Amino acid sequence: MTGSNSHITILTLNVNGLNSPIKRHRLASWIKSQDPSVCCIQETHLTCRDTHRLKIKGWRKIYQANGKQKKAGVAILVSDKTDFKPTKIKRDKEGHYIMVKGSIQQEELTILNIYAPNTGAPRFIKQVLSDLQRDLDSHTLIMGDFNTPLSILDRSTRQKVNKDTQELNSALHQTDLIDIYRTLHPKSTEYTFFSAPHHTYSKIDHIVGSKALLSKCKRTEIITNYLSDHSAIKLELRIKNLTQSRSTTWKLNNLLLNDYWVHNEMKAEIKMFFETNENKDTTYQNLWDAFKAVCRGKFIALNAYKRKQERSKIDTLTSQLKELEKQEQTHSKASRRQEITKIRAELKEIETQKTLQKINESRSWFFERINKIDRPLARLIKKKREKNQIDTIKNDKGDITTDPTEIQTTIREYYKHLYANKLENLEEMDTFLDTYTLPRLNQEEVESLNRPITGSEIVAIINSLPTKKSPGPDGFTAEFYQRYKEELVPFLLKLFQSIEKEGILPNSFYEASIILIPKPGRDTTKKENFRPISLMNIDAKILNKILANRIQQHIKKLIHHDQVGFIPGMQGWFNIRKSINVIQHINRAKDKNHVIISIDAEKAFDKIQQPFMLKTLNKLGIDGMYLKIIRAIYDKPTANIILNGQKLEAFPLKTGTRQGCPLSPLLFNIVLEVLARAIRQEKEIKGIQLGKEEVKLSLFADDMIVYLENPIVSAQNLLKLISNFSKVSGYKINVQKSQAFLYNNNRQTESQIMGELPFTIASKRIKYLGIQLTRDVKDLFKENYKPLLKEIKEDTNKWKNIPCSWVGRINIVKMAILPKVIYRFNAIPIKLPMTFFTELEKTTLKFIWNQKRARIAKSILSQKNKAGGITLPDFKLYYKATVTKTAWYWYQNRDIDQWNRTEPSEIMPHIYNYLIFDKPEKNKQWGKDSLLNKWCWENWLAICRKLKLDPFLTPYTKINSRWIKDLNVKPKTIKTLEENLGITIQDIGVGKDFMSKTPKAMATKDKIDKWDLIKLKSFCTAKETTIRVNRQPTTWEKIFATYSSDKGLISRIYNELKQIYKKKTNNPIKKWAKDMNRHFSKEDIYAAKKHMKKCSSSLAIREMQIKTTMRYHLTPVRMAIIKKSGNNRCWRGCGEIGTLVHCWWDCKLVQPLWKSVWRFLRDLELEIPFDPAIPLLGIYPKDYKSCCYKDTCTRMFIAALFTIAKTWNQPNCPTMIDWIKKMWHIYTMEYYAAIKNDEFISFVGTWMKLETIILSKLSQEQKTKHRIFSLIGGN
């Protein structure tokens, strides 16, 4: 606990208003520096609507009482380090008090925080005590601003207390309450408040408590501060059995890495360490751990020195202030009082400047990211994270305990036991592995795994490390390795080479911290319902990632395509489609005797036996250096659990693969592949025959589905096999949580099977990879797409009040809604009714425009780049793209795409290869039951017809096609042509180019059968063939034929479909041209569109330009049409008709601002025509030579747009000072962004001259009032 393991610290302070962001930041800094367990603050001046403004990192539990007006207001802040459990809260509606009852470490505590009004304070407090009499007990503390002294010593004038105060003291005495400060300091003359009008000191802030609590009060003191005109009071309260609830594990502060001085100091330290300590007597493993210890100490020292330097002046002034106030309280003196006021003002200015810098840095970060698909937007919509604090747990007896010590013991013992069950039956492991055939890597592949680790591999891994992630136990972050890459990589290389030779890791590589993440929707009082995630040291992760990258190159040879989890190029929806195909096949079958089982594994990653894993790797042919390093990794790993912020005692990890290690998923898949191979090879476990293929399994890591015929025999043999596998591997299944679909025509047999199978029989649905698999495929829409619509409606309803513009809302749709929808489209591309898309579009548009009338037409927003890069997704086209992309898999004809060949239909599986860019089969029948592929085929043909494309004979028609096979060309000839020339007919050459394009083509002629050559020549030189094949392929054809990977496939098809189904829309830029009575060329329109995208890196700034160009703003003319009224005159009161160009430019009340802008341009020596198209649309004259100043002009113009929009429908004239303030805001934000992004030179080029002109136009009073000071010049 804060400060000690035996007491808590409580602070009380009147903050005198928190409506200023600077004041709130200063309060946060002060509270963090004091680090109390509980902080009571008064006079927040926040209203009921402003409660969200009071946020302090590390003090998430904040209880507030606020009124409707900006006065009074109290709050109690409880540190995250304090295990406080509230049981009752009472608030005053006017915000004068709040009472919170609760407990800390099972000791009861009641805190009443009071702000008494200036008049009648004693009577008010007395009334509060009367109202809350039943809640005040022997565990009560009352504190706050009482606005009255309680004793003679509480005033510097020694004036007697009045009658009301005497009555209050009497009431306190009757309820066994005492002034704790005065009791512990009976003769002290320290005060908390100075009254300037009366020139007197007084102690009107108090901590009052029950007499029973006095023995627990360790000490209390008054703390001078410069946040307000009050001093704070601090109380230390003893709590029995108080445990340290937070660990003090060191973690590198990444901000230090950005400090140039710190960076140079650390570079020198790293260089000196290795030069001094690298020798033959010290192993690289020990040297590396010693290096990290030295670095840790150096960072701590540098951070302490930096903080000391930063606070030296503040500490000096604070000491002076404390001494002067002490003297002033004893003997008042006017000159001393002036000195105190001066020091307070100086301290306030220093703190304000520091706070302002922090605020601007923070705002700059948001300035760059706000409304973009980035973290701020994600935070706005993310679900409230499950609380990681574990306050209750079921112990081994099944009883719920809240005792922190017992919770720690229960959790630690459970996970210690979980990871301690190491099997020693090595012979049984060998026997099991020898029973089944496993794939093996060849010598060349093994040598590839065992090649020496290189520096380039280490650099590539360091560059790819995700940033802003929690580090391992050593505290070093990914940013540390990236910042000192040049210095660290040479030694890391030597370290890894030493590990390769010796098979020994540094001790720190074995360490890990385990954090427990609650499984969603599970009972969190059960210790097994948490997911243990290992936080490993980054250096260990670098080594493991190198190993993972190497094995990943060969993983497809070792792992069957049934497994799609963590395998490159494989996707989860492959197995969903396969499962749907199997279910459809069973639905169609007349004789049903099948079962589909979704197997739930019990702590799968944590129970895998490490000896079995190592033996499996060896069985696959993996040996040598690669296996030696893996053996070393699993030699003696340890972990400590971080529970409620406290690090528990470490224990060994004898089983399992670490969740959080980059190598673990692949190692787990390799182990589970042994079981998968065994299931496939066991003939007594009969799968389901789909055409020529027997389908038994689908896996995504440990999520397994098994498809079986003859359930009684097959399921029993499956369970027996899994039981045998469990004995050697540690893998176990939870049969009660495993679910199954049972299909049988005979009710008696079905009942028998249900009685013998231990699985839960599902009657309607089974959830698999986020999709509801249904017992009958006809229910797929009902169980998946209808709930999806409901979920989206609920989400958008939850998000309706988020502080986000329409542009940000479009990005939320793209970031949070579109991926969900596409995943459903991918997994279940069935025919959807139009009502689904209508409802989906209606919901998203309602969210984007926040229940209001749309300002910009959907057709304009949906067109790419028409809205400055803010493109509204067209869900129907995404659906069409997802459905059609199956054709790419047909053309590729990959062996791994079993899901694509096994759909029940009248088409034979081998025919899919000949569907697109091939000769149509006359007798082809899809059949009425074709659920997915027929729908793809119909969409494919429809799009080809739309494009007027020949879908059958094209430049991408394959040599191994029906066109060539129907010529009775020998397979050997086809193979020879493919090996020597390519896979398409165009590669052979058509017309006069037939087999004469290259010397290799001519040489291939001699290798093929003469009769085949004659047939081929006849076909390839035919006029019809030449016309249809010898042409430039279209973009549509290239999408399906030229890309070897399906990465980005949907986006490519979608972008092409947007062009195909493009609709004519009103061009807003042409409307501007009409309003301005002029013509814009294509170049002008392109310039305006480009300007929307490039005018600023901040979307918050770009949004104004987008809104202006897209004609977003309502005008009197437009409103008159909407409301069907006759009043279309300018809202500013000039009397003219309020068209859009009038409101932005022509209005005589707006013109003075634009003339001021042009005066600034002349001061910048820029001669630009006084033309509205330039500031409003960014269309500069073609002969404008000062292109380098366009960035400067753009900032000025956009600031002017903001200023005009601010008074859009008000009878006010936009002022020059408002325009300058907006410019300065943009300037300040870009300044901090430029420093952070190392773009300061270009920033200076844009702003330097303009900064000088702005400062020259303002008086010193204006500069001070609006805090406008030079940032580039620094004066």
From Swiss-Prot:
Protein name: LINE-1 retrotransposable element ORF2 protein
Binding-site positions, Mg(2+) 3: K556, I559, H560, H561
Role, per record: Has reverse transcriptase activity required for target-primed reverse transcription of the LINE-1 element mRNA, a crucial step in LINE-1 retrotransposition. Selectively binds and reversely transcribes RNA with a poly(A) tail consisting of at least 20 adenosines. Also has endonuclease activity that allows the introduction of nicks in the chromosomal target DNA. Cleaves DNA in AT-rich regions between a 5' stretch of purines and a 3' stretch of pyrimidines, corresponding to the sites of LINE-1 integration in the genome.
GO biological process: DNA recombination; nucleic acid metabolic process; retrotransposition
Residue span(s) of domain Reverse transcriptase: 498-773
Outcome recorded upon mutating D703Y: Reduced transposition efficiency
Residues holding Mg(2+) 2: E43
Keywords: DNA recombination, Endonuclease, Hydrolase, Magnesium, Metal-binding, Multifunctional enzyme, Nuclease, Nucleotidyltransferase, RNA-binding, RNA-directed DNA polymerase, Transferase
This protein's domain notes: The FADD motif is located within the catalytic core and is essential for reverse transcriptase activity. The C-terminal segment (CTS) binds to RNA with high affinity in the nanomolar range but without apparent sequence specificity.
Gene Ontology MF: a single term: RNA binding
Subunit-structure text: Interacts with MOV10.
PANTHER family given in the database record: REVERSE TRANSCRIPTASES
Additional observations: Long interspersed element-1/LINE-1/L1 retrotransposons are present in more than 500'000 full (6 kb) or truncated copies in the human genome. Most of them are inactive but one estimate is that 80 to 100 of those elements could be transcribed, translated and active in any individual. An active LINE-1 encodes for 2 proteins translated from a single RNA containing two non-overlapping ORFs, ORF1 and ORF2. ORF2p is described in this entry as a representative of all ORF2p potentially expressed by active elements. ORF1p is described in the related entry AC Q9UN81.
Outcome following mutation: T192V: Reduced transposition efficiency
Motif placement: FADD motif: 700-703
Outcome following mutation: D205G: Loss of endonuclease activity and reduced transposition efficiency
DUF1725 domain boundaries: 1242-1260
Keyword Nucleotidyltransferase assigned: yes
EC number: 2.7.7.49, 3.1.21.-
Positions with a binding annotation for Mg(2+) 1: D600, D702, D703
Listed InterPro entries: DNA/RNA_pol_sf (IPR043502), Endo/exonu/phosph_ase_sf (IPR036691), Endo/exonuclease/phosphatase (IPR005135), RT_dom (IPR000477)
Region described as Carboxy-terminal segment: spans on this chain: 1096-1275
CDD domains recorded: L1-EN (cd09076), RT_nLTR_like (cd01650)
